Amino acid sequence: MIRKIKPQIRVIGFDDGTFSFKSKIKRDKTILVGVVMKGSQDVVGVVTRWIEVDGRDATEKMIEAIHNSRFKDLRIIMLKGITYAGFNVVDVEELSRETRMPVIIVIRKKPDLQAMEKALKKHFSDAEEKISLLHKAGKIKELIPGKLYYQAIGVSYDQAEEIIRLTQKSSLIPEPLRLAHMIASAVMSGESKKE
């Protein structure tokens, strides 16, 4: 739990790079980028790892990136959803526990969990495990009606909303996530994609 939220709170925001349908078949990898910022203003650094498309290593790679980084004063982990590289689902409870930090999941469009579960059951032998991870993320809260949603682990909803607002700059998406998205898409496709 966070006692006091400062405007320059150290946040790491993770997003993944693009990948093709062919990547899904071959189980290729895509990049995972974590952008470390002080609030919404100063970029402090960037961490990267490679994760398997539709794999099971996103959680482990995030934990590894944080533990092996020089950024020891991080206070919050932000995720742009909990599915990375297709259906490489993050175990947000494990991520929070192993890093000893709260996790805030920011979502632009409210996910259709039933459709996700149906797709998982149709295409994955480990569907039940992935579905369980989806539900571990907790209740989906609406921050901006029809435009921005979030989930919070290890931090109150009020604090999560305050942190989201503190880290927004020129977009509804918090700046660490927006920049992670731009960097990851540029690495994978040669140029950044619009958020």
From Swiss-Prot:
Which portions of this protein are annotated as coiled-coil regions?
none
The UniProt entry, under NCBIfam families, shows: PRK00766.1 (NF001977)
* Cited PANTHER family: UPF0215 PROTEIN MJ1150
UniProt lists the family membership as follows: Belongs to the UPF0215 family.
Which HAMAP family does the record match to this protein? Answer: UPF0215 (MF_00582)
Q: What is this protein called?
A: UPF0215 protein TSIB_1161
Species this chain originates from: Thermococcus sibiricus (strain DSM 12597 / MM 739)
